[in-house]
Regions:
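Conserved ATP-binding subdomain of kinase catalytic cores across diverse folds
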Residues: 50-53, 58-169
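ATP/Mg2+ or Mg2+-diphosphate-binding catalytic cores
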Residues: 321-410
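ATP-dependent phospho-/nucleotidyl transfer catalytic cores
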Residues: 118-227, 238
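Conserved NTP-binding catalytic cores of kinases and kinase-like/nucleotidyltransferase enzymes
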Residues: 1-106, 390-410
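Active-site acidic catalytic loop and adjacent metal/ATP-binding pocket
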Residues: 32-49, 54-55, 211-257
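Active-site activation/catalytic loop segments of kinase-like enzymes and analogous catalytic loops
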Residues: 82, 256-313, 339-355
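A glycine-centered beta->alpha junction motif in the catalytic cores
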Residues: 59-65, 112-126, 145, 268, ...
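Short, flexible, glycine-rich and Lys/Arg-enriched loop motifs at helix boundaries
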Residues: 61-73, 271-286, 310-325
Length: 410
């Protein structure tokens, strides 16, 4: 019989007391549950004497936003913990350390990041992070290269593919991102004022073809171990530091899905900026920074990935002239396509982003949603034609100009 049960704050304290070498025997531990996501309990445990602190995260057997009618396997906690360990091994400065775990309790204990800010919150507050593109480019290059056939023994990689089969959470992605926004679904969640946009998504067969091709790649391409949910709510930042958390959606899939997720969330904040920034000059500066950062995410990833390829690939066929360029061209196209799907999903499907949802002015919020959808659709429609990440700037600025001009006529 399983010992699993949702922990109380007292039980969380008792568990972390037994982690070797962290809290002293004289520690006076206090605990509060701070989880604000849909899938987990998160306990913040602090020693009031030393101020040392730790995080304990426990998976729930259902989706909190829906309830017990949407059950989930607790094995995702094991997947998240192993993904964190894998990522920390490859990028120790960019991923919190796992300090303890209990797979039966679906519990992982890790380094506390209270000194950092959730990136989504920081962006909403108007902060910029000049080192972010460098850091996340490094994270993406190392985690994707060294878990792919390019960077590890191919047979060992196949064993990892087995360990990270994650059907339930992949199904969430397949439904919420790559299916339901393009048809009627009870999971869709949007304001009636953009029903025209939702109807356009349901009837655009050209768009559907591109989404179908991206969905096929998501479901069939085991290129590398992905984080699987790499949005700005899964990234903690300071001006000097970046930490990636929450890889419970981890699985083997197409590299562009992770890179596209980061870019998509920067573009969602771009669309939301009129709700958070006053004045044309300040708005332009903030949007320019967000767009340039999105471009730099790819450029930093690509530069590091090429270096890792040149230094570490042992398969002689992977060194064939032209292969590296073609490989990365396809990853770029996937990145843009998946970024577009991610943007669309955050407006139409379940679970939106605070960047847009918490805008107080309803007219500004609607304009942000319409701009996000225009950007998302443009990215999906052009993904197979893209040859340079710098084209992203033209696509986004064109969509912005068209939406702004259209809004001024109303």
């Amino acid at each position: 019989m399983s010992k699993y049960h949702p922990l109380t704050t007292e039980e969380a304290i008792e568990f972390v007391k037994n982690i070797p070498g962290f809290f002293s025997q004289e520690a006076q531990l206090e605990c509060r549950e701070i989880g604000d996501g849909n899938l987990n309990l998160v306990f913040h445990i602090t020693d009031s004497k030393s101020n040392k602190s730790i995080i304990a995260k426990q998976a729930l057997p259902y989706v909190k936003i829906v309830g017990e009618s949407w059950p989930l396997s607790l094995d995702r906690a094991r997947i998240e913990r192993e993904a964190l360990q894998q990522e920390h091994q490859l990028c120790p400065e960019l991923v919190p350390a796992v300090l303890g775990y209990d797979d039966e309790l679906a519990l992982t204990v890790m380094e506390d990041l209270s000194s950092h800010t959730i990136m989504r919150k920081g962006l909403i507050e108007g902060n910029t992070y000049p080192l972010f593109a460098n850091h996340i480019g490094e994270f993406l290059a190392r985690t994707l290269f060294f878990t792919s056939d390019l960077g590890m023994n191919q047979q060992d990689k196949k064993e990892l593919v087995k360990r990270f089969i994650n059907p339930e959470l992949c199904k969430i992605t397949e439904d919420l991102i790559l299916d339901e926004p393009y048809r009627f679904s009870d999971n869709n969640n949007y304001g009636v004022y953009i029903e025209d946009e939702a109807e356009a998504l349901r009837t655009d067969q050209v768009l559907h073809l591109e989404v179908a091709l991206l969905r096929e790649r998501f479901m069939t391409r085991t290129e590398a171990l992905l984080h699987g949910d790499l949005h700005t709510g899964s990234i903690f930042v300071t001006a000097e530091s970046t930490k990636v958390i929450d890889p419970e959606f981890a699985f083997y899939g197409p590299m562009g899905f992770d890179i596209g997720a980061v870019i998509a969330n920067l573009l969602l904040n771009y669309a939301a900026q009129p709700g958070w920034t006053s004045g044309e000059k300040a708005l332009k500066e903030k949007r320019d920074w967000l767009l340039e950062t999105a471009i730099q995410v790819w450029e930093q990833f690509e530069s590091r990935f090429r270096t890792l390829w040149d230094e570490h690939v042992t398969d002689h066929l992977a060194r064939t002239p032209g292969y590296q360029d073609l490989y990365l061209q396809k990853v770029l196209q996937d990145t843009i396509g998946f970024a577009g799907c991610k943007v669309i999903r955050r407006i139409i499907s379940l679970s939106h982003v605070a960047d847009i949802d918490t805008i107080a002015d309803p007219d500004i919020k609607e304009a942000a949603e319409r701009l996000a959808l225009a950007i998302g659709k443009a990215l999906v429609l052009c993904n197979r034609k893209l040859h340079s990440i710098r084209e992203l700037g033209d696509i986004v600025r064109t969509a912005t100009a068209i939406q702004t001009k259209g809004a001024s006529r109303i």
